[in-house]
A protein has these predicted regions:
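A generic structural motif
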Residues: 28-37, 94, 216-221
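Donor-nucleotide binding loops and adjacent catalytic segments primarily
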Residues: 44, 49-53, 177-182, 186-234
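An amphipathic, basic-hydrophobic alpha-helix
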Residues: 69-98
Length: 234
């Protein structure tokens, strides 16, 4: 009988650190029996995404290392400490074989708690430029999976590094054009231009493209993912 692989995923705050982890969970499940748990933020969009994938979700406190003045800089160290303590509790209770993170400050104290317990930590780097959270987790990580070869240079101290390409769920490759045309009321003939700054949109991108839309709409059918709450600004 195959041993069940226990995997603790950490990340969130936005869709960026969440969707690669869901893809990894899906891929591992196809290889053999797995049991997963996800530690995320208390206010990010990841809880709905994780629970929809059938993974138990637990919110833990998260701080942020800001490089600018904010009153939250005085309280965030306590949030980070609390996140580490609660993360340690989950590690001791769940006893994962491996911890997997794709970024986000909520993951940092969990990564170091895992290292203290001797649990391997796998880091996913899906952007060209590593964020601060991933750079902070690098010393606690046993292995790195990266998309862009240029980003590997920032993680030379991680002993195992592997170019994995895009980490996406199978459903992305199984899209149905006819269903998309019906949902967005598209004509199947003209090309479609998708504008997105990620799951939360990007205010700068949203505003920058406004003068260009009339010209683009002469040649393309435009789908603009603005991010939740950003549509009113357009």
């Amino acid at each position: 009988m195959a041993t069940t692989l226990r995997v603790l995923f950490t990340g969130g705050g936005s869709g960026g650190p969440t969707t690669p982890l869901l893809a990894v969970n899906e891929a591992l499940g196809a290889l053999g029996p797995t049991e997963s748990r996800f530690l995320g933020t208390t206010s990010g969009p990841e809880q709905a995404m994780v629970e929809e994938a059938g993974i138990p979700f637990y919110a833990i406190p998260a701080g942020k290392l800001r490089r600018y003045f904010s009153w939250q800089n005085f309280t965030d160290p306590f949030r980070i400490l609390a996140g580490g303590i609660i993360g340690l509790k989950h590690l001791l209770q769940f006893k994962p074989h491996v911890v997997v993170s794709a970024g986000s400050f909520v993951s940092v104290p969990v990564a170091y708690a895992a290292r203290a317990l001797g649990i391997p930590q796998v880091l996913l780097q899906m952007d060209v430029l590593p964020g601060l959270a991933n750079r902070l987790m690098a010393p606690a990580s046993s292995a790195l999976g990266y998309y862009f070869p240029a980003s590997e240079r920032a993680f030379r101290r991680i002993p195992e590094r592997k170019h994995v390409g895009p980490v996406v769920r199978n459903s992305v490759y199984q899209g149905d054009p006819e269903r998309a045309n019906q949902r967005f009321q598209l004509n199947p003939d003209p090309p479609v231009l998708l504008i997105t700054g990620g799951g939360q949109g990007a205010v700068g991108l949203n505003r920058a493209i406004q003068p260009l839309l009339p010209t683009w709409q002469e040649h393309f059918q435009v789908i603009h993912l603005t991010g939740r709450g950003s549509k009113a600004d357009l």
